[in-house]
Amino acid sequence: MAVEYECCGTSFFIHIAVIVLLVLFAGLMSGLTLGLMSMSLVDLEVLAKSGTPRDRIHAAKILPVVKNQHLLLCTLLICNAAAMEALPIFLDALVTAWGAILISVTLILLFGEIIPQSVCSRHGLAIGATVAPFVRVLVWICLPVAWPISKLLDFLLGHGRVALFRRAELKTLVDLHGNEAGKGGELTHDETTIIAGALELSEKMAKDAMTPISDTFVIDINAKLDRDLMNLILDKGHSRVPVYYEQRTNIIGLVLVKNLLTINPDEEIQVKNVTIRRIPRVPETLPLYDILNEFQKGHSHMAVVVRQCDKIHPLQSNDAANETVNEVRVDVDYERSPQETKLKRRRSLQKWKSFPNRANSLGSRSKRWSKDNDADILQLNEHPLPKLDEEEDAVGIITMEDVIEELLQEEIFDETDHHFEDL
């Protein structure tokens, strides 16, 4: 095809200007396709809420544009394709056919693909926020063609998929942001450790943090608080001491060591004559977060970890057996007759984290030290001493400190612990 416009004429310069605009427009569409579509809605929401002041402004401008991702993608690709297809038409009027093909391919590859995508991949947020109003206009112009295609993509591929990190991925992401990873992160070792511990805490259970019964310091309810026992309690350095009845695995309560300050060792008062607080019993499979939530209520910072034995009554149906296994029982009330206790085991019981209703029924005792304080005290004179159920086996003791250590992923030492280490 012959050249239609010779050099230096008015039409020649008009065609040159149109060609330049088409190349720039195609490059902008190509760069925005990579820059805007590579940013997920989650990333933009994070920047809009917690980014730098400039990033917050940019993210707020871009979010409404990229909210409908398929419509935006169709608009950018349609505009890019239109510009690239129109470029050879105007070039063909200035140069020969082979020259038009060579020049158009070079311009599109260099100025329409490589350079724009390189720039927008690095500065896509700022560029996208700058041209966001222009992109909205293009969306309305291309709406008759882009909207049906975007709806078809929504139907086939789904709409509004949010790319969230799984727990393991989030933990790895936190580790990479630590300054020890050498990638420019600003999180310290303690920060990354605590965050990782919080993420792993939901996967850990009571049996992972408990102290075995064999390694636990416990006292008999009938023991005398003489000078030897008081010195032993003092040497152990615990703030709470579990109390058992008849056998070590039958933990019925706990004694606060601070309540023993007024006890005269020479009087040899029995343990059962001092204030014994109730101690809850938790299954060994109870998540640590549920235990932590219950500890925060203030009823007790120590619990007995029990294991369910495989003893099922012959008359019990399979459905009832499955229901008993799948449910979690937390026994914090010992003021029940044996018949009530047996009936309680057959009822549908709740996990600790669903206990607010029960707490309200007991007068909202959580964090209220002056109300219903007697409900946490073991009444020995009015009721028989409790015993461990036959289908349960006490395996350990867990405290608030044990849960916090799992959260921090480090041992917590107090003054007494350091004293024993020095020895």
UniProtKB/Swiss-Prot annotation:
Principal place of residence: membrane
One Pfam family recorded for the sequence: CNNM
Every CNNM transmembrane domain range: 8-191
Subcellular localization(s) per the UniProt record: Membrane
Origin: domain of life: Eukaryota
Extracellular membrane side: 1-11, 92-94, 158-423
Residues in the Cytoplasmic compartment per record: 33-70, 116-136
Membrane-topology descriptor: Multi-pass membrane protein
Protein name stated in the entry: DUF21 domain-containing protein At2g14520
Species of the source: Arabidopsis thaliana
